[in-house]
Amino acid sequence: MGDPPPSQAGAAGAGVDLRATEVSLQKIAVWASVSLIAGTAGMLPLDAFDGTGTSTRQIDLPTWMEDPAGDGYGYGDWAYQVLASEMLRGNAVGIIAARGPRGLPTQIVMQHPDEIGVRRDPTTGEVEWRVAGTQIPTSDIWHQRAYPMPGRIQGLSPIGHHAATIGLGLNVLRFGNQFFEDGGHPTAILKTTASLNETAARVAKTRFLAAVSGRREPVVLGGDWEYQAIQIAPEESQFLETHKLTSIECCRIFGPGLAEVLGYETGGALTYQNIQERNIQLLIYALDPWLVRLERALSAMLPRGQYVRINRGALLRTDILTRYRAYQLAIRNRIQAPSEARELEDLPPLTPEQQAEFDSLPSPAPTSDSGGSRA
């Protein structure tokens, strides 16, 4: 028995079929959330380590991890596919195309989530995977799930679980297009004090439209006629309010804080400090759970004792003055070596001549934020 497919939108989102993964991305808030998390994760650098505790040492990242799919598009492209699949369908499935000497995967080609089929044989209990209708040996399947549920092979699909909310949001957009482009309401009223039957009213309307069609000249009306334009604010149809609410809810499907970071829910002036706080909020509440899943998946493909860490510091990169003060504090308290600070700034090691220049300079006086004390 397999897992249930993603459902169609409920009553609120009637007419919207979300069974195709790309349909949900038509909702801008869904697209923005997926793009922000998957895109950001793919841009953050990877570091590999060996050992634990005081014996931990950084090692070279395996060359295959620079392009896990082996298609030339690189790690960032591959990571985007993994996280986008997990965020939209709750699962990321790839085919293991190559293995290393220890039998660990060294090439994984991601598959479109809508082409994946899986079932558990009720007699043998074995799991059967199919990709685009072709059965694939379970040993060749690489599967990661974001929302695991007891008794299910695949994780919950966020899009299927929240189909009504996303469907409502798409219907609101469709209504908005019709409202503003097709004229979802009459644009004006042509009134007269005379009594008109249906035929006379139709003739008057036709003649008026013929008089104003394609012209910018003023229209002359008799004393018995009055033209009144209808101006309906979009708020009166609850278009913007509903659009805003569904956008906020769509963002929250993928993590708290995304609605605020993407600007769907705001409050107060946006300052540099607020931007820094938002980056931290994004990392802690929305992005980090996805980064941890990706780290664990990558670490599982390394020999025992080795693991991968995604460098989150690149996301929280501050202004140059703040960074230099942080380096000074870390170096004075022997948390970080000067060479490490230079490496973080993409600077080469000091040459002997540069080192001599530094040695000839007087020692700087301790500062209030140095964390140390005077000798």
Predicted segments, located by residue:
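C-terminal hydrophobic structural anchor segments
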Residues: 284-330
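Structured, contiguous alpha/beta core segments that scaffold functional sites
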Residues: 1-239, 243-245, 249-252, 264-267, ...
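Short acidic alpha-helical/loop segments enriched in Asp/Glu that coordinate divalent cations
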Residues: 220, 258-270, 297-304
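Glycine-rich and small/hydrophobic secondary-structure elements
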Residues: 281
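Generic, well-ordered alpha-helical scaffold segments in large soluble proteins
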Residues: 207-211, 249, 253, 257, ...
